[in-house]
Amino acid sequence: MAERKYFGTDGVRGKVGSFPITPDFALKLGWAAGKVLATHGSKKVLIGKDTRISGYMLESALEAGLTAAGLSAVFVGPMPTPAVAYLTRTFRAEAGVVISASHNPYDDNGIKFFSAEGTKLPDDVEEAIEALLEQPMDCVESAELGKASRINDAAGRYIEFCKSTFPTSLSLEGYKIVVDCAHGATYHIAPSVLRELGAEIIEIGTKPNGLNINEKCGATDIEALRHKVLEIGADVGLAYDGDGDRIMMVDHLGNKVDGDQILYIIARETLRAGHLKGGVVGTLMSNMSLEIALKQLGIPFLRANVGDRYVLEKMQENGWKLGGENSGHIIILDKNTTGDGIIASLAVLTAMAQHKLSLHELTGAVKLFPQVLINVRFAGGENPLNSEKVKAVAAEVEQRLAGKGRILLRKSGTEPLIRVMVECEDAVLAQKSAEEIAEAVKNS
């Protein structure tokens, strides 16, 4: 596979106004993608975005590029990333585009593509697009230019799809739910889904102004959600991130329920229903208690590299249907082709309604082990993880933790940092062990 110049693991991303997140690059990217995709079928590309102010600029530039290449641009407006994947499939579009930087601040943005099936573009298609980005732009004949249109009921279509994943025999009548949409792409979707299923909804993070996405709210900052749940005595709190592919939850006591615990609840319910195909995929950062709890249910568990892309790859390699990250990306392939915060939250709410149990009771089997993370900066040059001294200290700590904890040492891919993670039932031992390894890295 050729080295990527523009496409990262999650499309093209960066600071707005700095290359490559500029209108001229978006125009060229739309044109290059259009040229490659125009050789296929429907000649329609669906474009969705989150609520960042820069989305207007970037979608207009993409539209110009796509139509110049002979493809039609179909806008769905602010829409969660998983909704774009779903609508791309059902609309029979040639591809889908999401303009979002997920959980990042408002002045970042990104552009990523979905295939006609609602999955990541194949490597050879991305490579063909990158190759064209190096070529001068041209324009098709006037009669072959693409058009621009809008799906006015896109939100309604996705709301109905989300509701269809919740059993018709159940209702959320009687539940008081706080929903935090991070002033992001779920702001007009999630509250409607939950209200239509019968719940009483209290909204926070549903007033986007283009500049406030993810600001002290959403899946990456649940303090406002926790406060509101406790203040009004809600049954549960749900926090989505800016583009709606992550979910974090808060139980009625104000405890955070993360992606590992959510994954466990969904795995157990899927097993009980007789629908679990194979096992569950987590990541190197998944809590050891998740692995132990799944093992007690007889559910196989595999770890992928950190990143929902790698989780999905390992799921596909093994033919499994369920995976996720502790950060709240939960992928249920029986329901959607990518991480979907709303659908994952509905799966947990199904378990609550089905068994008449609180979220706190459902998470009882997964008592998360304390995790200590220390970032150690080094001077560059030789990788400290190759040092015999570091290896010896790490081996000693591993022996000490055998059966009751684990360590993970990773070199950052973007800066001279070694990330030291120690996880153990005993928080004091975890802290002491992490500091020991960090000290060895510093002195290597």
Swiss-Prot record:
The active site is at S102 (phosphoserine intermediate). Activated by phosphorylation. Its cofactor is Mg(2+). Keywords: Isomerase, Magnesium, Metal-binding, Phosphoprotein. Pfam families: PGM_PMM_I, PGM_PMM_II, PGM_PMM_III, PGM_PMM_IV. PANTHER family: PHOSPHOGLUCOMUTASE (ALPHA-D-GLUCOSE-1,6-BISPHOSPHATE-DEPENDENT), PHOSPHOHEXOSE MUTASE. Belongs to the phosphohexose mutase family. This is Phosphoglucosamine mutase. It comes from Actinobacillus succinogenes (strain ATCC 55618 / DSM 22257 / CCUG 43843 / 130Z).
